[in-house]
A protein has these predicted regions:
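Core RecA-like ATPase module of SF1/SF2 helicases and allied nucleic-acid translocases
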Residues: 1-176, 180-181
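Short beta-alpha junction loops
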Residues: 184-189
Length: 189
């Protein structure tokens, strides 16, 4: 079973914006022990870059396709034709997507991806290393952002409780050369 935590995704995006003021995207690892969290972070980073493309008038088939995939995922395929029929201009649609994200997922930092306003092609060319803890063993990077995901009153961190979990945490914590950012719920972890 894989878990998601939208509050932590929002925090990751805000941290990425901060880190991009000092580092290049290739200097960043974004890690989580949960694949669902990693996939969602990748989607939201790509969406933010795609929204930059729209604002910078860099629309491309890849940007349009990425936005459509995102909308299909979160609005449902059956609602897409109505969405396009009812909305006016493309910028109104983008504005709607932003307010939808802010309301549904608490994504207040969805407006751009860093002050550098990276485009979707920048992100696809450079690619943040957004991956699970297991996949980066033996690798290091200047900045590591870790989203632990689990948040509950029972202090249940799932598989991270066991010996293997402690080893995974140790691997994740030791990958940063310069900056380590931990995103977690302190009462849980």
């Amino acid at each position: 079973e894989s878990y998601l935590n939208y509050g932590e995704i929002s925090a990751v995006l805000l941290e990425v914006d901060e880190v991009l003021e000092r580092y290049h995207p290739e200097d960043i690892f974004i890690l989580s022990p949960y694949k669902a969290q990693i996939k969602a972070i990748e989607r939201f980073i790509s969406l933010k870059a795609g929204l930059n493309d729209f604002e910078l008038r860099l629309e491309s088939p890849a940007t349009n396709e990425g936005l459509l995939k995102f909308l299909e995922t979160w609005l449902g395929k059956e609602n897409i034709p109505e969405f396009y029929k009812d909305m006016g201009s493309l910028l109104e649609k983008i504005s709607y997507v932003r307010s939808f994200l802010a309301d549904k997922f608490y994504m207040k930092g969805i407006y751009n991806l860093g002050k550098k306003r990276l485009s979707l092609s920048d992100i696809q060319a450079i690619r943040f290393t957004v991956d699970t803890v297991d996949s980066i063993q033996g690798q290091e990077n200047k900045v590591v952002i870790i989203s632990f995901v689990r948040s509950n009153r029972k202090k249940n961190v799932g598989f991270l409780n066991g010996f293997d979990g402690l080893q995974r945490i140790n691997v994740a914590l030791s990958r940063a050369k310069k900056e380590l950012v931990l995103i977690w719920n302190p009462p849980t972890v």
